[in-house]
Swiss-Prot record:
The modification N-acetylalanine is found at A2. It comes from Rattus norvegicus (Rat). The gene is Cryl1. Belongs to the 3-hydroxyacyl-CoA dehydrogenase family. Transmembrane segments: none annotated. GO terms for molecular function: L-gulonate 3-dehydrogenase activity; NAD+ binding; protein homodimerization activity. PANTHER family: 3-HYDROXYACYL-COA DEHYDROGENASE FAMILY PROTEIN, LAMBDA-CRYSTALLIN HOMOLOG. Homodimer. This is Lambda-crystallin homolog. NAD(+) binds at L16, I17, D36, E97, K102. Its main location: cytoplasm. The lineage of its organism: Eukaryota, Metazoa, Chordata, Craniata, Vertebrata.
């Protein structure tokens, strides 16, 4: 078996995101300690990880160069926070998206860690200035926001606190590359970071188009899945602009007036309530009933699609 990568990783919280991070770090050869306050939660998480890794290995989708048993041997559980973080080089917090809970966790960590470990939060929208301000080890703090489900979608947004040391960003970036994720540097904090700001802009306009009777919910989803989404799976909106003309300058010369005209027709932020909720819910439930069994089956199908897409993207990388 290959030697474990230097330094250990600690995962705080054994839910879906925590389990996914544990699998990703193990795939890179890192020893992983999974911490939770409830021993039964740890036991359940380790069993879930075992089942998923075995399934991934059978389907040829397991990440990394190590086999499932080798990766599983790198993951252990721990119910004592001080013991868990001893000797760690990276701590990834994965507790629920609650500011006070996360601040409590980081305050506890701040009292017991050394001056070398990276303190990273998986928060999807809480600003680093709200999470880390006042900590003695604030220079070692960063948000590393994964995309759900992290094992199948590689993007990780790295968001610094205003006092985060450049070395913390660099080390976290290198670590994400080591486990074959795709890190992006958010140069300064902003509400919603980058991914959710783009996602919410799409959701907002999608909602308005349905609410105003322009398009049905199902057809709206098709516009993304069979239209924009197919391009955006391989190139982003800015490169799309660049390729859809003779470069970016040409695109802006040709289309900027039309874009501005349409953008001026966008309405206010929707309320996401009332009749439109019922309308969208009805169409979605016709496609996927909202009982646990059907939702789980659809998520499983989604994850299979994402894994196959990930393989295709790897194969299609430009030479």
């Amino acid at each position: 078996m290959a030697s474990p990568a230097a330094g250990g990783v600690v995962i705080i919280g054994s839910g879906l995101i925590g389990r996914s991070w544990a699998m990703l770090f193990a795939s890179g050869g890192f020893k992983v300690k999974l911490y939770d306050i409830e021993q039964q939660q740890i036991t359940n998480a380790l069993e879930s990880i075992r089942k998923e890794m075995k399934s991934l290995e059978q389907s040829g989708s397991l990440k990394g160069s190590l086999g499932a048993e080798q990766q599983l041997s790198l993951i252990s559980g721990c119910g004592n926070l001080a013991e868990a973080v001893e000797g760690a080089m990276h701590i990834q917090e994965c507790v629920p998206e609650n500011l006070e809970l996360k601040k409590k966790i980081f305050a506890q960590l701040d009292r017991i860690v050394d001056d070398q470990v990276i303190l990273s939060s998986s928060s999807s929208c809480l600003l680093p200035s709200k999470l880390f301000t006042g900590l003695a080890h604030v220079k070692q703090c960063i948000v590393a926001h994964p995309v759900n489900p992290p094992y199948y979608v590689p993007l990780v947004e790295l968001v610094p606190h205003p006092e985060t040391a450049p070395a913390t960003m660099d080390r976290t970036y290198a670590l994400m590359k080591k486990i074959r994720q795709t890190p992006v540097r958010v140069l300064k904090e902003i509400d919603g970071f980058v991914l959710n700001r783009l996602q919410y802009a799409i959701i907002s306009e999608a909602w308005r188009l349905v609410e105003e009777g322009i398009v049905s919910p199902n057809d709206l989803d098709l516009v993304m899945s069979d239209g924009l989404g197919m391009r955006y799976a391989f190139i982003g909106p800015l490169e799309t602009m660049h390729l859809n003309a003779e470069g970016m300058v040409s695109y802006c010369d040709r289309y900027s007036e039309g874009m501005k005209r349409v953008l001026k027709t966008f309405g206010p932020v929707p309320e996401f309530s009332g009749d439109t909720v019922e309308k969208v819910n009805q169409d979605m439930c016709m496609k996927v009933p909202d009982d646990p069994e059907h939702l789980a089956a659809r998520r499983h199908w989604r994850d299979d699609c994402l894994m196959q897409l990930s393989k295709l993207k790897h194969q299609m990388q430009p030479q």
